[in-house]
């Protein structure tokens, strides 16, 4: 009985073992015919060649793209410095000029005061809840509490006490104010 061998092997009944087909391609057994057929071998080799070429080109193109982007960033660092610092600001140089002007004006007085244009700015809220509610106190901006945010839920709990031996009133009776006093004097 012949043993099951791999696709590229045949069973040698003299040795009772599987042997590679490439050893018998000059006179192949029936199981090695597809492996040793030159037309099948060349088509498989052609497929592997196409795959290796595709993989090589992909690797070369990705390395070239990375190198070009790296070189462009190194050659043009001024473009990154000119970008606006805050999302609402369109011209970053105008903000720096304003800061320099305020800084020179402040240096005549107290050195510990920093210009307001260098402070961190927060954009105004544009949602309906923020527009309807007015900020309180000295704050320029309104930050809603977590329970007021969209999708938040509020947990409401009630306290119950031991009313002695009488039964505890139901929640509906407590809410409606219909509970009867348990202790009478």
UniProtKB/Swiss-Prot annotation:
Disulfide bridge map: 5-18, 21-32, 25-36
GO biological process: adaptive immune response; lymphocyte homeostasis; tumor necrosis factor-mediated signaling pathway
Any one GO MF annotation of this record: signaling receptor activity
Predominant location category: membrane
The TNFR-Cys repeat ranges on this chain: 4-36
Protein name: Tumor necrosis factor receptor superfamily member 17
Native organism: Mus musculus
Function: Receptor for TNFSF13B/BLyS/BAFF and TNFSF13/APRIL. Promotes B-cell survival and plays a role in the regulation of humoral immunity. Activates NF-kappa-B and JNK.
Native organism taxonomy: Eukaryota, Metazoa, Chordata, Craniata, Vertebrata
InterPro entries in the record: BCMA_Tall-1-bd, TNFR_13C/17, TNFR_17
UniProtKB keywords: Adaptive immunity, Disulfide bond, Immunity, Membrane, Receptor, Signal-anchor, Transmembrane, Transmembrane helix
Cytoplasmic side: 71-185
Quaternary structure, from the entry: Associates with TRAF1, TRAF2, TRAF3, TRAF5 and TRAF6.
Localization terms from the record: Membrane
């Amino acid at each position: 009985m012949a043993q099951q061998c791999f696709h590229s092997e045949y069973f040698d009944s003299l040795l009772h073992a599987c042997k590679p087909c490439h050893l018998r391609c000059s006179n192949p057994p029936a199981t090695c015919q597809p492996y040793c057929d030159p037309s099948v071998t060349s088509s498989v080799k052609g497929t592997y060649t196409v795959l290796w070429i595709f993989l090589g080109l992909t690797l070369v193109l990705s390395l070239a793209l990375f190198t070009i982007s790296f070189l462009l960033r190194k050659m043009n660092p001024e473009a990154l410095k000119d970008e606006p610092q805050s999302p609402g600001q369109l011209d970053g140089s105008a903000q720096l000029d304003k800061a320099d002007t305020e800084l020179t004006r402040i240096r005549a007085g107290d050195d510990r005061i920093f210009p307001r244009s260098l402070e961190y700015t927060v954009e105004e809220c544009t949602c309906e809840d923020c527009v309807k509610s007015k900020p309180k106190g000295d704050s320029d901006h309104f930050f809603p509490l977590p329970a007021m945010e969209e999708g938040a839920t509020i947990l409401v709990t009630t306290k119950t006490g031991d009313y002695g031996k009488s039964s505890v009133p139901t929640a509906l009776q407590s809410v409606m104010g219909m509970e009867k006093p348990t202790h009478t004097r």
